[in-house]
């Protein structure tokens, strides 16, 4: 981008009555040499920008990986940085623990899960949860014209809801408006309401320095074996629906909404919206219908396996 994000400076403050370097709060300060309008997002949430010749922004970050997005006009720059967890004096550093989906979702370890619906099960007996990613204060990625990913997601999710209902499925949405259900509340609800499968809808964007024309692809993610076969079946059809977008296949990634051990779950990244062509395609209701029909066909293939 032309007006690059110059700095993302971490400033740590000592806990009360402690000496440096013990910390309990970490803040990020950014600056850019421009007098144009900027927007700054920290972990998907817009934060206040204070004008100080260029600008100054301050927001609390959390231990682990954080994402800082700087948006100016049609340009978006994304920087990721890590913050160490404050340690007690004399404490040895310990590696981070892997996610425990049972603990995360409050599922008993001895819980018995329903099998995948048998081939020939009437669609009306199959419960599908459709999740429109992001929402509320979490906007997700931004398109060149400033449209937010959360809005692309809800449009595609509602289109999918209609397509599933036309095929006879029972459908539940995690959100139908500009709300933000907490990430773990989405899969928890799928468990609580005994869903047979869970589909999360997202749209992608390149990170800092990335070329969206080179990076542009569609992909469907799963986080465990239970979801991977579903992801593969869906991605085969989605890839054809969004041609000539490159097919990145079905991939495994640890995602909060997909680590559900009880319900087969996957996350579909339809297209790259920070590319004008991807933005235009994702805003096209005809293309949305094609993607929705593709996901339905993928689900039907998976059920027949």
Where are these regions (language model features)?
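Catalytic-site microenvironment of enzymes
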Residues: 2-305
């Amino acid at each position: 981008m032309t007006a690059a994000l110059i700095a993302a400076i971490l400033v740590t403050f000592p806990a009360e009555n402690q000496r440096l370097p013990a910390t309990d709060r970490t803040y990020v300060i950014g600056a850019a040499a421009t007098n144009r309008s900027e927007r700054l997002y920290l972990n998907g949430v817009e934060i206040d920008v204070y004008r100080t010749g260029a600008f100054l922004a301050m927001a609390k970050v959390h231990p682990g990986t954080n994402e800082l997005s700087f948006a100016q006009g049609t340009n978006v720059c994304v920087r990721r940085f890590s913050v160490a967890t404050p340690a007690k004096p004399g404490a040895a550093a310990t590696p981070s623990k892997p996610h425990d989906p049972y603990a995360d979702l409050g599922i008993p370890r001895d819980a018995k899960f329903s099998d995948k619906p048998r081939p020939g099960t009437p669609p009306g007996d199959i419960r599908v949860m459709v999740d429109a990613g992001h929402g509320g204060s979490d906007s997700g990625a931004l398109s060149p014209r400033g449209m937010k990913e959360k809005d692309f997601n809800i449009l595609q999710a509602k289109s999918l809801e209609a397509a599933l209902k036309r095929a006879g499925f029972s459908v539940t949405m995690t959100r139908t408006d500009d709300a933000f259900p907490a990430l773990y509340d989405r899969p928890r609800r799928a468990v609580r309401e005994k869903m047979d499968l869970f589909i999360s809808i997202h749209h992608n964007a390149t990170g800092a320095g990335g070329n969206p024309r080179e990076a542009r692809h569609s992909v469907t993610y799963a986080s465990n074996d239970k979801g991977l076969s579903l992801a593969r079946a869906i991605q085969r059809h989605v890839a054809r629906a969004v041609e000539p977008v490159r097919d990145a296949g079905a991939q495994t990634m640890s995602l909060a909404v997909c680590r559900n051990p009880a319900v087969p779950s996957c996350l579909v990244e339809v297209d790259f919206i920070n590319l004008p062509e991807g933005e235009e395609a994702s805003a096209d209701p005809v293309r949305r219908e094609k993607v929705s029909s593709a996901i339905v066909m993928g689900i039907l293939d998976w059920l027949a396996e």
